[in-house]
Regions:
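Generic short beta-strand segments
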Residues: 43-44, 63-70
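A short, exposed loop/beta-hairpin motif centered on an aromatic-Gly-Thr core
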Residues: 47-49
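Short nucleic-acid-contacting surface segments enriched for D/E, G, S/T with interspersed K/R
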Residues: 51-65
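A generic structural signal for short beta-strands and their flanking turns/coil linkers
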Residues: 34-36, 59-63, 78-83
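OB-fold/S1-family single-stranded nucleic acid-binding modules
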Residues: 68-90
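Amphipathic alpha-helical interaction segments
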Residues: 41, 55-57, 75
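Short, basic/aromatic beta-hairpin or loop at an interaction surface
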Residues: 29-44
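Structural detector for short beta-strands of small beta-barrel domains
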Residues: 2-32, 86-90
Length: 90
């Protein structure tokens, strides 16, 4: 059984996407971390994850993502975001 299938089976709320194209990738400082925001082709929701250092831009690349759906409140408005736990180039 693959790592992804094991993760999905163990964590019921976890979702996975294969070979999706990255339309936009933004990296910005947030405390001691780099906050990465990725927009994917065919999705209107931002996918976010943290890293300790900056990485090469993923814009135009195909990636595999494992993520949780969550909602954040910004200025009193609930916004849907995806919290990425695993991202890999496909």
């Amino acid at each position: 059984m693959s790592d992804v299938k094991k993760l999905l089976k163990k964590h019921g709320q976890l979702n996975h996407l294969d070979a999706v194209k990255v339309v936009s990738h933004v990296q910005r400082d947030k405390d001691d971390w780099i906050l990465n925001t990725v927009m994917l082709e065919g999705y209107d929701v931002p996918f976010q994850y943290n890293r300790k250092k900056q990485y090469k831009s993923l814009t135009g690349a195909q990636v595999n993502l494992t993520f949780y759906a969550e909602s954040k409140t910004v200025a009193g408005i609930a916004i849907e975001m995806m919290r990425v736990v695993r991202i890999r180039r496909s």
